[in-house]
């Protein structure tokens, strides 16, 4: 990562009905409003406040969306950003690049992402046509770690993912993925080497877009950083299963790296991803609600938080300045 003016930050925002399964996600205090989370995150990244979204996303305990952190870093570093509509379920006031993909169905449906191939191709073309030295790719999709587990299962990779919840509901996710495999008539590893099919039958629209975007950019000679945790590592697995071997970096947070249930180091190593971990040292402001919940194990990552923090560090911006900016954005929104 370089953090230069030739760095472009792309946020893929979408939805999956898998998020409606009780106990799966903390991405929104009210399940009825969870579908607005990606749309709100896009607005927060773009404007620093919501525009059309009815709420600022918070967890049931009040943990603010990682978009607050990413926006704070953007205000400090000044990196260029864009939002890709990767299956939004609700409208956003942020300008978006369209891929034509619809919101994903529950992965326990036979074909939760029927338009995966078209979206992958559209994202590939967009990534291949970009003029930038470095592309940092992020995601926002409630329920995305469960769909990531589904894709890993289809590809035959270890089924280990993180969670936005303090206690990762691994057993629940495993049951959902087992049901999804059965619904699609699949066994573990049946779609190894078939990344688009893995997303179509076991994934979500954001994974299709992120993987296509990364593959296109890499084929164009652009450096690619996957900004996130196990979901972005899963996107890396999709790229590898498509036969792309160029170097990629996974930039994540200390919260994901410290989550024993996530196994991020092993997952990244399996996909030949270099790992950058950034610690925002929230302990220094542990009484502030914008940071306390992260220290308690909530959220951990999302909206490219790890990638944004890495860009701040590489720009020589201290984490004390980052924490102050986070408080400023938190108070504003």
Curated annotation (Swiss-Prot):
Give the species. Answer: Halobacterium salinarum (strain ATCC 700922 / JCM 11081 / NRC-1) (Halobacterium halobium)
Judging by the UniProt lineage, the source's domain of life is Archaea
The record, for CDD domains, names: DMB-PRT_CobT
Name of the protein in its database record: UPF0284 protein VNG_1572C
Example GO molecular function term? nicotinate-nucleotide-dimethylbenzimidazole phosphoribosyltransferase activity
UniProt cross-references to InterPro entries, sorted A to Z: Nict_dMeBzImd_PRibTrfase, Nict_dMeBzImd_PRibTrfase_arc, Nict_dMeBzImd_PRibTrfase_sf
| Annotated family | Belongs to the UPF0284 family.
User: What S-S linkages are listed for this chain?
Assistant: none
């Amino acid at each position: 990562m370089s953090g230069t003016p030739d760095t472009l930050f792309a946020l893929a925002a979408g939805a999956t009905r898998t998020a409606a399964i009780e106990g799966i996600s903390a991405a929104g205090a009210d399940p009825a409003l969870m579908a607005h989370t990606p749309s709100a995150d896009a607005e927060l990244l773009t404007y620093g406040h919501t525009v059309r979204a009815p709420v600022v996303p918070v967890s049931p305990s009040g943990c603010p969306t990682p978009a607050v952190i990413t926006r704070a870093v953007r205000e400090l570093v000044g990196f260029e950003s864009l939002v890709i509509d990767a299956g939004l379920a609700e409208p956003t006031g942020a300008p978006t690049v369209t891929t034509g993909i619809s919101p994903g169905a529950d992965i326990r449906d036979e074909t939760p992402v029927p338009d995966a191939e078209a979206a992958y191709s559209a994202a590939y073309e967009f990534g291949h046509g970009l003029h930038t030295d470095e592309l940092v790719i992020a995601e926002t999709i409630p329920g995305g770690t469960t769909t990531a587990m589904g894709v890993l299962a289809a590809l035959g990779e270890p089924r280990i993912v993180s969670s936005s919840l303090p206690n990762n509901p691994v057993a629940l996710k495993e049951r959902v993925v087992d049901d999804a495999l059965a619904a699609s008539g699949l066994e573990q590893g049946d779609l190894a080497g078939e990344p688009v099919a893995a997303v179509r039958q076991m994934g979500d629209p954001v994974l299709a877009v992120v993987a296509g975007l990364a593959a296109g950019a890499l084929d164009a000679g652009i450096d690619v950083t996957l900004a996130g945790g196990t979901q972005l590592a899963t996107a890396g697995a999709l790229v590898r299963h498509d036969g792309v071997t160029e170097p990629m970096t996974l930039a994540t947070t200390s919260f994901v790296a410290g989550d024993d249930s996530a196994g991020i180091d092993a997952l990244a190593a399996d996909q030949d991803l270099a790992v950058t971990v950034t610690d925002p040292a929230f302990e220094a402001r542990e009484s502030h609600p914008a940071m306390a919940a992260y220290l308690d194990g909530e959220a951990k990552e999302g909206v490219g938080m790890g990638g944004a923090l890495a860009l701040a560090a590489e720009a020589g911006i201290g984490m004390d300045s980052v924490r102050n900016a986070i408080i400023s954005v938190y108070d504003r929104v």
